[in-house]
A protein has these predicted regions:
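Periplasmic c-type cytochrome electron-transfer domains
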Residues: 1-352
Length: 352
């Protein structure tokens, strides 16, 4: 029988699927990390605040509900100001994310091994003394205007938005009682919210696959085609084809950051002349040599988590492999109209 989840995990699970953490209470963490899509949203780029529905069927609503408690306009609904605003990066799966020492595509939440505490770019988060990258990571989407915060909380800095989320939970009798039961305190603390969400995500570890059975000696667990693919992947058939240089170990990642010349699509992160470039790791390290570098993803369950790369530029694993094989040709011939609205083509032009 399946072991019953602890009260902490149950609390984290409820928070993860509850829209109470978002500004207008219209979406939850699960909107972009849903079990139906292997804990992604199946989209190239996500629709956060102002969206309706799930996955590839999610669309921008005409109106935006403003939370009554923090309404700026005095109206319950306003014209949706987020129409057309896609999240800049592809929503990664959180399956096995508990095993990663860096979180986010740019690694802006990182456990560097110097001491026990996680380092981020935000002093308010660092001041919590969190030792779990998952816990620190959980505190960022709720303050992102386009992802979850919206405009219901007003133009407040991140730590004040988090304070309002905690206040909302405290005023909710159900959650107030749940937190007191789990943590034994009369008032809810921000770090408790973070630890509860992290506890749920730590349950999402899946490490049994045909490949695991194969390396344990069950040679029949892979087809002959898969075995030939593995020999190519590990550079045994062709040394020049050695995916394991970056995708190695149990998680098939080197935990590093690389510039793979992935076509720039989407709204970007403020880089370049148009502001639509995404400089990736350089936005964290402030080192120009890290421009366009992104975290090497784990290949665990990769067949379930399309589309691929930091901005969802490619829809299939075959396209990803072809890009690696001919980076320049693949980039020059890339047609972004397949994936995103023309407004967000960035520096990439449709193929002639």
């Amino acid at each position: 029988l399946k072991e019953e989840d602890s009260p902490l995990v149950q609390l984290g699970t409820d928070l993860f699927f509850d829209p109470i953490l978002s500004g207008d209470q219209s979406l939850s963490c699960a909107t972009c990390h849903h079990p139906l899509f292997a804990m992604t949203d199946g989209r190239v780029l996500s629709i956060g605040v102002g969206g309706v529905g799930l996955g590839v069927e999610r669309f921008f609503g005409k109106e935006l509900k403003v939370s009554d408690e923090y309404s700026l306009s005095g109206k319950e609904k306003i014209a949706n100001p987020f129409i057309g605003l896609l999240i800049a990066r592809n929503s990664p799966t959180i399956i096995n994310s508990a095993l990663l020492r860096t979180q986010f595509w740019d690694g802006r939440v990182e456990h560097k091994g110097r001491g026990d505490e996680v380092e981020t770019l935000e002093p308010a988060v660092n001041s919590l003394g969190l030792k779990d990258p998952l816990a620190a990571q959980a505190l960022f989407p709720i303050v992102s205007t386009a992802e979850m915060a919206g405009i219901s909380f007003g133009p407040k800095v991140s730590h004040l938005v988090r304070d309002l989320v905690v206040k909302r939970l405290q005023e909710n009798q159900h959650y107030s009682a749940r937190f007191q039961e789990v943590f034994g305190t009369s008032s809810i603390q921000l770090h408790q919210v973070a630890h509860a969400l992290a506890a749920f995500e730590r349950k999402l570890i899946f490490n049994e696959s045909p490949w695991d059975h194969y390396i344990e000696g069950e040679t029949s667990s892979l087809t002959e085609t898969q075995k030939r693919g593995a020999l190519l992947f590990y550079g045994e058939l062709k040394p020049e084809v050695n995916c394991s240089v970056c995708h190695s170990g149990d998680l098939q990642t080197d935990f590093d950051f690389h510039n793979l010349m992935v076509p720039q699509i989407g709204p970007g992160k403020g880089g370049g002349i148009t502001g639509r470039e995404d400089y990736g790791r350089a936005n964290v390290t402030f080192d120009f040599r890290d421009q366009y570098k992104f975290r090497t993803p784990s290949l665990r369950n990769v067949g379930l988590t399309a589309p691929y790369f930091h901005n969802g530029a490619y829809q299939s694993l075959e396209q990803v492999i072809r890009h690696h094989a001919d980076v320049i040709g693949s980039t020059l011939n890339y047609d972004p109209s397949v994936n995103v609205p023309a407004t967000y083509y960035s520096s990439v032009l449709p193929a002639r």
